[in-house]
A protein has these predicted regions:
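Regulatory sensory and allosteric helical modules in signal-transduction proteins
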Residues: 98-162
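Juxtamembrane interface helix immediately N-terminal to a transmembrane segment
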Residues: 1-17
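Long, hydrophobic/aromatic-enriched structural stretches that serve as scaffold segments
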Residues: 1, 22, 39-43
Length: 213
């Protein structure tokens, strides 16, 4: 930001000097300096973008690695169709959680990729109350109606959610006990998340704090 402002100020001063009648080598040197500063600014912006992109890729790789590891430890059956992902507080928006990376192992985003209110669903409940939450929806129950009546979703939002029968949300804390986000798991089966698996997932997701903090 400092470089950008400096470039603008120098460029304006150069134009003023040139318009005031300066010419020859002196004016050319000033103009050349402004061009050099502009090019330097573009270069640093490009470097900053590349570093930021690389860091983002690295973070996503690490998060996926953690989810993959705990997933494998639980030995879920293929029929359970378990998915795992992470939601973290959106920068500058305390009331919004954003999905960090795609679901593992399906490699797809949820319908709330652009943001989920902390007031909705078990993910929001887990984040607000800073405690783990497991929910099982019986087959005979209406999944869509349940989301609307119990979790604050609109009908349109509920229609966009893929039908699942069991959900597990685990809060992710930093070293000071502040909740940073939520590790989320769901399944098409009712009894997928046994106490043993919940314990494995809870302990296994602790390292996520390093990558979303």
């Amino acid at each position: 930001m400092f470089v950008d402002r400096l470039v603008v100020r120098v460029a304006i001063k150069c134009l003023v000097l040139l318009s005031a009648g300066f010419s020859g080598i002196f004016a050319q040197k000033i103009w050349g300096l402004s061009v050099a500063l502009f090019v330097l600014s573009v270069f640093f912006q490009a470097v900053d973008y590349l570093i930021s992109h690389r860091l983002t890729t690295l973070v996503l790789e690490r998060i996926t690695g953690v989810l993959e590891a705990v997933y494998a430890c639980c030995d879920f059956s293929a029929e359970a169709d378990v998915r795992a992902t992470v939601f973290a507080q959106s920068p500058g928006r305390k009331d919004i959680l954003r999905q960090i990376g795609k679901y593992y192992p399906t490699n797809r985003y949820s319908s709330f990729r652009r943001g989920l209110s902390t007031s909705k669903g078990i993910i929001g409940f887990c984040f607000r109350n800073q405690r783990r939450y497991l929910e099982v929806i019986k087959k005979e129950a209406s999944f869509k109606a349940h989301l609307v009546e119990n979790w604050g979703f609109t009908r349109e939002e509920a229609d966009a959610v893929k039908v699942r029968r069991s959900y597990l949300a685990i809060p992710i804390f930093d070293a000071h006990g502040k909740v940073l986000g939520v590790a989320y798991f769901d399944s098409v089966k009712e009894h997928t998340f046994t106490p043993e698996r919940i314990d494995i997932l809870t302990r296994g997701c602790v390292p996520l704090a390093k990558w979303i903090g």
